[in-house]
Amino acid sequence: MKEVVIVSACRTAIGAFGGTLRDMNLATLGSIVMKEAIKRAGIDPTIIADVRFGCCREPVDSLNTTRISALMAGVPETAMAATINRVCISGMEAVISGMAYIQNGFYDVALCGGMEHMSGITYSVPTARWGCRFQDQVFVDDIVHALHAGSHILPGLEQGPIKEGEIVERFRGKPYIMGITAELIAYKHGITREEIDAVALRSHNNAERATVEGDFKEEIVPIELPQKKGKPPKIFDKDEHFRPGLTMDDLAKLPPAFIGKIGKVTAGNSSGVNDGAAAMVIMSADKAKELGLKPVARIKAVGGGGCHPSVMGLSPVPAVADLLKRTNYKISDFELVELNEAFAAQYIGCEREIGLNREVTNVNGSGCGLGHPVGATGCRIMVSLLHAMKKRGKTLGMATLCGGG
């Protein structure tokens, strides 16, 4: 099979929910990173055969948003385009699937990444289509329902590996939001609230430090936002989800978000609901050599795996095990690691089961501090990993994350 290399990697700054990017159109957001990835690669867009981007919640007026973004970015209409949904893993899946096409000789160049505009996810009235008749109907928050990841249709938390305890009894046979999966992992591993908050604090503090010291400057694509008439455009180029100066005392004051009294998962030790996009140009090593391009990195191997939905946050455990089996690497061989913090408790569960060294993991913050624009995060952590490796002079890194469902 052909060797696959990355020749450019970039991302937008991550917007807070209802923050600076609130009124940004998703297709426009995606086009910004696509255009910049092409520019940084130094290629003619006509050589791009396929554009593959992750997205979990496309706007109804722009299905296959990837295609629209690609055309806006100047990618020729002859290129294919696909929008990939593997929930939180979507952005990484877009890269992996593009890599597979290249490895097997289907084409040589792909533009891959992910995008999400969670501020733009709407409310819906499911019963309105066929008539509400003489009764009130409810506006459904599509974000909240999405965060239940199918458990309204397929409940059964008690069928997972954790079969007893108060949490299981409360949700037996009922749908459950993703925060409950983090509570179950905390229960499984006996993780304390203080341990969870410590990971969240590190994430926020690392994100703040990296921002202040300019560690993200090379990876972030500035976004120019028009203002009211007569005012200069606003430049959005810094992540805005993290809380500056956050302390353990601040986190300790927050109440449980999903289970009263006994819960350990809070808004402060969970990932954010965010807006953002990330992109990279990948190609065969032969094509890069032909074009005289210096790759940013090589994609050496991929692993994957799944687990019961009730502990979905532990899915990096079998995925990493699969990767190690395929490569004969040891976890200690990786000089830097990105493991997305969907929840701080979930991160700790993975850290313990995989045997991660926290000192080299999520060194510039992760989901808790930076935020989690779901369709983009899989690619975002790859982008951030590559830039952190370059800055620190490292040569072998690993990026992994969980996905609900």
Region annotations inferred by a language model:
Residues M1-M24, S151-V168, M248-L314, P318, ...:
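Condensing-enzyme catalytic core mediating Claisen C-C bond formation in acyl metabolism
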Residues R11-T12, D23-I32, R40, G156-I162, ...:
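N-terminal extracellular/periplasmic Venus flytrap/periplasmic-binding protein-like
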Residues R22-A110, G114-D142, I220-F236, S310-V311, ...:
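Conserved beta-ketoacyl condensing-enzyme motif
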Residues L26-G42, T65-S69, A94, M178-I185, ...:
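Short, well-ordered amphipathic alpha-helical segments that serve as non-catalytic structural scaffolds
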Residues C55-A110, G120, G173-Y176, G245-G272, ...:
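Conserved catalytic cysteine-centered active-site region
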Residues V109-L184:
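Flexible glycine-/small-residue-enriched beta->alpha junction loops
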Residues I180-E183, F216-E219, K229, K300-G369:
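Active-site pocket-lining segment
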